[in-house]
Every structure is written in C-alpha cells, then in structure tokens.
C-alpha cells in the first residue's frame, strides 16, 4: 500500500470487546460484559482506510481477548500487509492459546511481531494454566533469549509477560451506590500525567479515539440505560473520528496524543496504585 498517513508511535485496534476474563476496573469496561466481535472483512477494510490517514510505528491487536476472534491469524497477516513497517502486537491473557496452535508460526512469518501476555489471577491453578499455555505455544518452540525483565525474544518475535496482580493497577472509574461513575477530581492535566494508557489512541468500530477508556463510554452507557446520566454528559459529547475526517482535525488529534484533554477528567487525578483484584474466569476448565 502507498499514501501513508500521519506518523504516530502507537495505535490500538480493538477487534472484539468479548473476553474470557472479567478484570475488576478494566480500563475499557470489558468486565461489564460487552459482547462484540468485528467481522474480518470489516477489519481489513477499516485498516486500509486508516493506513491512508495514520502511519503508526506500533500496532496492537487487542480486545477483549483477541484470540477469541476466529480469524485472528488472518487479521495479524493483514495487519502486517497494511502496516508494513510497524511492530504488530497481539495482547492476550493466554487462556486460549491451545485453541490457536499456529499463533507462533504466524507471528514468525509476519515478522517484527510481539506477544504481550497479561496475568490477571493469583489463583495458582489459573497461573499454572497460563504458564503451561505459554510454554506449549512459545517457549518450547525455538530458542528464546531474555532481552529484558519479563521479556524474551525468538527470531523476530518478542514475548513480554506482565502481572498486574503484583501491583501497578488502579480503578479507571468509581462506583457510587452500585453505579459506575466518572471520577470528579476535575484535574485533567494530572489525570493525563498519571494515566497508564494516555498515549494509546484506539480504533473501535472504525472510529478513532484518544484512549481506550473513552472509546467504550457510549457502548457501556447505552447497554445500561445511562445515556441521561448527568455525570457522564461531558464525556458523551466526545466523538471519535471517522477515517474520512478533515485533515486539520486529524492533525489536531495527533498533536493532542501527548497532551491532556478535557475528557481526561473522567479518570482519577491521583490514582492509588494497587494489586489487581482477582479476575473472574469464564469457561476455563481447571
């Protein structure tokens, strides 16, 4: 493909909001059961559209749990074709690796690829499953070298394992009388400064959003009949960009990736870092 778009460092593409885990405080409301799987043909068409507008160094295929998508191999292959020079990353919790036995071969074939595995359970039985799955899918195949803490490399594939149950987790929203609410610190600069996902614009249903948390606000509020909630009103006014948006509008968006936005007020200004609470595991036998 030709006619590259504006250069950015990172771009996430959310191919599904379905997940086999429910992690308390998930940055994109996934723990509240939002089932959606984008059609493969739409993903390819949308990526091709956005390539003409954005030229990322790093593209992350994410969910939900992206391995739930039946065409995940093809999605990774197409992502490489379209974003030809970018690192192509897939972000997973590793529970479904046995159902995707060719994932390592696909990643080696596309090259310049990365797997990010995030562990969300302290339960030894679940941790054993994750470790076994990682060994069978990756570590047992090829020669891996430790390149940094929790990161190994084999040929042109990088595997990084993180564990938020050990710390560094915080609640992107708060619960008031059993209802999910935005934070009310009203300090978007501080919220942006302390945010863990502040430089990761994301494509969701073919719209480009500043960050993962804002991308799912309307989806969550619609499902829970909260569109009239006054506390969420400022954030419902935010709209993602379409791939045919005005060039100046997109340039403004790109510049703002590294700056706070008024929508940053929905997240805490001074988040309290903590170990992530145990994720609810769905449909996994132990």
Where are these regions (language model features)?
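Disulfide-bonded cysteines in secreted/extracellular proteins and peptides
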Residues: 19, 23-26, 195, 211-213, ...
């Amino acid at each position: 493909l030709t006619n590259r778009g504006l250069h950015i460092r990172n771009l996430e593409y959310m191919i599904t909001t379905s997940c086999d885990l429910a992690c308390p405080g998930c940055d994109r409301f996934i723990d509240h059961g939002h089932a959606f799987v984008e059609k493969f043909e739409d993903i390819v068409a949308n990526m091709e559209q956005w390539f003409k507008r954005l030229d990322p160094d790093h593209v992350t295929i994410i969910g939900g749990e992206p391995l739930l998508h039946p065409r995940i191999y093809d999605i990774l292959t197409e992502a490489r074709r379209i974003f030809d020079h970018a690192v192509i990353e897939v972000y997973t919790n590793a529970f479904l690796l046995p159902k995707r036995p060719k994932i390592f071969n696909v990643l080696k074939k596309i090259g310049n690829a990365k797997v990010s595995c995030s562990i969300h359970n302290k339960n030894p039985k679940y941790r054993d499953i994750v470790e076994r799955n990682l060994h069978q899918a990756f570590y047992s195949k090829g020669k891996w070298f430790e390149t940094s803490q929790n990161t190994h490399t084999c040929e042109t594939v990088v595997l990084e394992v993180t564990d938020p149950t050990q710390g560094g987790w915080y609640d992107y929203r708060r619960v008031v009388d059993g209802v999910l609410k935005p934070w009310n610190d009203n300090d978007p600069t501080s919220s942006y400064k302390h945010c863990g996902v502040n430089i990761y614009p994301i494509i969701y249903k073919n719209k480009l959003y500043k960050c993962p948390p804002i991308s799912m606000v309307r989806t969550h509020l619609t499902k829970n009949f909260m569109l009239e909630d006054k506390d969420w009103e400022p954030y419902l006014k935010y709209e993602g960009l379409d791939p045919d948006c005005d060039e100046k509008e997109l340039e403004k968006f790109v510049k703002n990736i590294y700056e706070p936005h008024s929508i940053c007020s929905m997240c805490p200004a001074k988040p309290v870092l903590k170990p992530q609470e145990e994720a609810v595991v769905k449909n996994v036998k132990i």
